[in-house]
């Protein structure tokens, strides 16, 4: 090996990290120092000298040898790092970390000598599945509840209700109370942050506000003032208030009630643009059943994906989780911006940290699941063919041609390819896994679905159907 060649040695570390031990030749160090001096000389302004004509020694005296070496060292490390990655054909997941620290390297740096540098970085983990075929999962057996149709109708009636004033009776559940209130902690007497309002419309329904608040307003009359001694739940959203006792002074300023429309053909026309109540009920039933079936499919797929993830063997580097967390925060910021909110003022360091902490568990699960699917694709040689991508792209031709914005075709192709691959992987899981349904009341598991390539047409098995990997948010 030539004396002026970079020497690279790599050592695998736990958690999918790699250590790079670099020996950088003195020729590289000299070249970078001279390039740094020439670069600074072209822009430095020193009285008595023209730009680019400043003697080397004058420049060193003016700027300082340490500062020059620091600038050169940054260039040396970056240049050698990029070269080392090419030599070893390694794609890093994270920025390299200097093991000895920059200041330590700078202290011993000399352009006349070779330089030894140790850097560490994260790389993609090696993936392995303990098992891919014959996964078995158990889900709760659930039936469509016809009562949900009536509940949906009632909800619709409430949406189209007339609001009328109440003057001759006390408040009751179902009313809309206009209240003012002021809350303080019982032990300290300190006012509760967000616990004060001059006027708020409050629907008197159970589980609104903290326990006892709504119940305390029931039976009050307009003009009444009442003291409520309450307690915040232990799992309350604001940590400072959890489990604390509180005192609220509440005044009932006004009272209203909902006048619900009759369930008839006129209501069907008003609420759902249907000709009759029978037609409206039929439409609601179809929507609810479709949603129910989709939810059941989603639950089944979630269980299969969880089972697959449990079979994954991989040392996942921290940087992969960090990237997922950062992407989640950026997506949240984009949603805020689309709503017209000032992202810069809203996303304080405290909020960003809070979001990072709260989303990390889900981010970790997402990364594990994606890696498990990737491992499945590699293990079972499941791929997306070019004709499948071309066919999918045709669905977007009109949108692309009509869009006023420049569409990144390469990025779109990548997204569509990933979506198609995920669909194929989920179908494969359904066809090669066993799903058991357990009856909640008896707690007995009943086999309802087992399909493999060999038994796909067996009459005693039920093939699970394709679905997308989504959870219904509560």
From Swiss-Prot:
Free-text function comment from the UniProt entry: Involved in protein export. Acts as a chaperone by maintaining the newly synthesized protein in an open conformation. Functions as a peptidyl-prolyl cis-trans isomerase.
Protein name: Trigger factor
Record HAMAP family: Trigger_factor_Tig
Entry's Gene Ontology cellular component terms: cytoplasm
Catalytic activity: [protein]-peptidylproline (omega=180) = [protein]-peptidylproline (omega=0)
Top-level division of the source organism's lineage: Bacteria
Keyword Nucleotide-binding on entry: no
EC number(s) on file: 5.2.1.8
Entry comment, domain topic: Consists of 3 domains; the N-terminus binds the ribosome, the middle domain has PPIase activity, while the C-terminus has intrinsic chaperone activity on its own.
Signal peptide: none
Native source species: Prochlorococcus marinus (strain AS9601)
Segments of skewed composition (Low complexity): 442-467
Location relative to the cell: Cytoplasm
Spans annotated as Disordered: 435-474
Family designation: Belongs to the FKBP-type PPIase family. Tig subfamily.
Biological-process GO terms, alphabetical: 'de novo' cotranslational protein folding; cell division; chaperone-mediated protein folding; protein transport; protein unfolding
Major location (coarse): cytoplasm
PROSITE patterns reported in the protein's UniProt record: FKBP_PPIASE
Domain PPIase FKBP-type: 174-261
GO molecular function annotations of the record: peptidyl-prolyl cis-trans isomerase activity; protein folding chaperone; ribosome binding
């Amino acid at each position: 090996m030539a004396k002026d060649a970079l020497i690279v040695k790599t050592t695998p570390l736990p958690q999918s990290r790699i250590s790079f031990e670099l020996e950088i030749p003195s020729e590289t160090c000299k070249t970078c120092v001279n390039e740094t001096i020439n670069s600074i000389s072209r822009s430095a302004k020193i009285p008595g000298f023209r730009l680019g004509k400043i003697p080397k020694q004058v420049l060193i005296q003016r700027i300082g040898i340490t500062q020059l070496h620091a600038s050169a060292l940054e260039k040396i490390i970056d240049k050698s790092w990029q070269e080392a990655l090419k030599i070893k054909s390694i794609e890093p997941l994270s920025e390299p970390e200097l093991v000895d620290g920059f200041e330590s390297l700078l202290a011993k740096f000399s352009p006349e000598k070779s330089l030894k540098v140790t850097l560490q970085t994260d790389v993609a983990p090696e993936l392995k599945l303990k098992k891919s075929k014959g996964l078995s999962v158990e889900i709760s057996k659930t039936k469509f509840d016809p009562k949900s149709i009536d509940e949906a109708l009632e909800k619709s009636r409430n949406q189209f209700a007339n609001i009328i004033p109440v003057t001759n009776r006390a408040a009751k559940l179902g009313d809309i109370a206009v209240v003012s209130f002021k809350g303080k902690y019982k032990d300290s007497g300190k006012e509760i942050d967000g616990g004060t309002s001059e006027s708020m419309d409050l629907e008197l329904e159970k589980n609104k506000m903290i326990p006892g608040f709504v119940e305390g307003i029931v039976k009050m009359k307009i003009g009444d003032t009442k003291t409520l001694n309450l307690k915040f739940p232990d799992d309350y959203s604001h940590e400072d208030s959890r489990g604390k006792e509180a005192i609220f002074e509440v005044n009932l300023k006004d009272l209203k009630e909902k006048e619900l429309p009759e369930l008839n053909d006129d209501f069907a026309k008003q609420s759902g643009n249907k000709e009759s109540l029978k037609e409206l009920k039929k439409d609601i039933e179809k929507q609810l059943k479709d949603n129910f079936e989709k939810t059941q499919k989603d639950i089944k797929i979630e269980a299969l994906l969880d089972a697959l993830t449990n079979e994954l063997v991989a040392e996942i580097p921290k940087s992969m989780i960090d990237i997922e967390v950062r992407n989640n925060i950026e997506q949240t910021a984009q949603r805020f911006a689309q709503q017209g909110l000032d992202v810069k003022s809203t996303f304080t360091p405290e909020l960003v940290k809070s979001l990072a902490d709260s989303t990390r568990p889900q981010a970790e699960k997402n990364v594990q699941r994606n890696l498990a699917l990737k491992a499945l694709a590699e293990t079972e040689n499941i791929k997306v063919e070019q004709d499948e991508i071309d066919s999918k792209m045709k669905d977007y031709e009109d949108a692309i041609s009509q869009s006023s914005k420049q569409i990144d075709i390469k990025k779109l192709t990548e997204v569509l390819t990933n979506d198609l691959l995920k669909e194929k992987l989920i179908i494969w899981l359904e066809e090669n896994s066993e799903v058991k349904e357990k009856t909640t009341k008896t707690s007995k598991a009943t086999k309802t679905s087992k399909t493999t390539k060999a038994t796909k047409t067996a009459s005693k098995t039920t093939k699970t159907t394709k679905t997308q990997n989504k959870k219904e948010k509560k």
